[in-house]
């Protein structure tokens, strides 16, 4: 089987990994103009026969680069949403409202076979797209994600925290705060949140406040005693219209923050752990990348807790991917758990793309008798705006080479024009992966030091 062939038994997939489906005002503002380009990530997942839907055209030179590695869809299977549609439309809406695009998608899919819609997150937008493909195009489509109502339930961090505690998963000390006010309006009074933070600060010097419906770090606030961070946090919360519940917890010092990626299928198939990675977080605890393999000493316990949560989710009708965050606590904690459950993302997350890319590449490496990829580190790197062609020209000797079984694979190329290069460094060892990424970062135009 060549690198560009797909197993005949594999059902075709329609990838629609647009983060615009996350309908949170603060998240959209946080991501800014880069948000429509997030759907590009699914190019790493697609195989021949799959469709990849994006909001914006993709650089042809990047598609060619992926093709040489045996990754990505066929060029004719890249579906660009209607660029004349309202800017308020999410990708799934653009596709659903464009009959020509729907019919073109249907024509690219095999007849009389089930097709899976693989979204970034399952929402009502994706559910409506499935119905449109079924009723208007006659395509047998199943959404490989939980129903929107189930996603909404598991997006509420305070409810998931309560579930985790009921299952016996270790959680940080803290409380849930409810703010008064009508939906989609700023809170009437933030005094309850202020009081909760002050109570927490009377017991510990470091507190974390998290909006209970948030994504990508857009709702995370760090409050330290005697720094003015309490006032700035309250001022920011007072402006927000998309949350009424906040978690106020002790900010426990962590040696590492592992993420467990699960796939939860319908029974009787077993729940699978796709992989455990260490999150790369900035000083504000915002996700910037992932490392594999994990360095946590608690890997077995963390995976066991994740699977326990996954089984309950499946019993409640959950089907699809889920990312579960933990921290490994810095010692000494002799009388307490060495790890804590932090939160659940009822969708794929940033770790999924490098994990899947490593698995795909290793399948091809194995068939060709080439070196196995044992480690990776992914990172979002600040730079000056740059094109993919210019980036490839300046880093060609560092890009992934199947013969070596190592190198750097840039992706999410739409973000390059905004001064962010996202890349996966793959290698035989974690040390080599870090070395390659540092070398790659040093060639970026801004030449900023990589932390």
State what each model feature region is:
Residues 41, 57-185:
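Conserved N-proximal alpha/beta basic substrate-recognition cap immediately N-terminal to
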Residues 241-245, 250-251, 274, 284-336, ...:
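A long amphipathic alpha-helix within ATP-dependent nucleotide-binding catalytic cores
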Residues 363-451:
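Peripheral (often C-terminal) accessory segments that flank ATP-dependent C-N-forming ligase machineries
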Residues 45-59:
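Short internal beta-strands
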Residues 282-283, 341-355:
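Glycine-rich phosphate/pyrophosphate-binding beta-alpha loops
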Residues 204-206, 223-281, 328-341:
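Phosphate-binding site of ATP-dependent enzymes
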Residues 30-48:
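Short catalytic helix/loop segments, enriched in acidic residues and glycine
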Residues 136, 151-245, 295-304:
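Active-site nucleotide/adenylate-binding loops and adjacent lid/helix of ATP-dependent enzymes
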